[in-house]
Design a protein with these regions (language model features):
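Class I SAM-dependent transferase core
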Residues: 1-76, 84-88, 92, 105-108, ...
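Conserved nucleotide-cofactor-binding alpha/beta core module
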Residues: 68-187
Length: 204
């Protein structure tokens, strides 16, 4: 079933071998609510707790590919959610710091990771809009929810050469990649339209 999912992703244009291998290795059904387990290897998003979703595998693969993650990359993830994206990053060999703003999801992820082989360097309950300055700079930052604007703290926390992958927009989002080219300059690229749940700010 995972192999079939990988074949689907390849047909949709995912080419990074490490990303495809991670998707092929990770048991996605473990990250899903029991009512949807039969559909774990379908390329679709499904509901999880707190009105959030586990992202479509294509979206996870595309964001990871755009991040250009390699073994040892220091990555900040904004929105732990189900933990599936976290696991993909970890499987590739990234050092992952992950922030979750929904307390219910944070506790669920915290308990889940204790039982699995996937262990983020740090799992933080907090506001993703402000990033994680104490651990900056990062090789990459990935935002797993739709942001109405690009939070400046996230750009500031990138290393030179680092990438911010963020879906920007209200109803639908444009996948946007900012690459830091100097202390003050960034290169911006866009990669088509996606749909994400909103990135929430400062509420518990």
């Amino acid at each position: 079933m995972r192999k079939k999912l990988v074949e689907t992703l390849e047909k949709k244009g995912i080419t990074n071998p490490a990303v495809l291998q991670a998707i092929n290795t990770i048991p996605r059904h473990l990250f899903m609510d029991s009512g949807f387990i039969d559909h774990a290897y379908v390329d679709k998003a499904f509901p999880i707790a707190a009105d959030q979703t586990i992202s479509q595998p294509y979206t996870v693969a595309r964001q990871t590919e755009l991040l250009e993650v390699v073994k040892g990359s220091k990555i900040l993830e904004i929105g732990t959610g189900s933990g599936y994206q976290t696991a993909v990053l970890l499987e590739i060999g990234a050092v992952v710091y992950s922030i979750e703003r929904q307390n219910k999801l944070f506790k669920k992820a915290e308990n889940f990771f204790k039982k699995q082989k996937y262990t983020p360097k740090k799992l933080i309950f907090g506001d993703g809009y402000i990033g994680l300055e104490t651990e900056a700079p990062f090789d990459g930052i990935v935002v797993t929810a739709g942001a109405p604007f690009v939070p400046k703290p996230l750009l500031a926390q990138l290393k030179i050469g680092g990438k911010l992958v963020i879906p920007v927009g209200d109803v639908s989002q444009i996948m946007t990649v900012y690459t830091r080219t100097s202390q003050t300059a960034f290169n911006k690229e866009t990669f088509g339209e996606f749909r994400f749940v909103p990135l929430l700010e400062n509420k518990n």
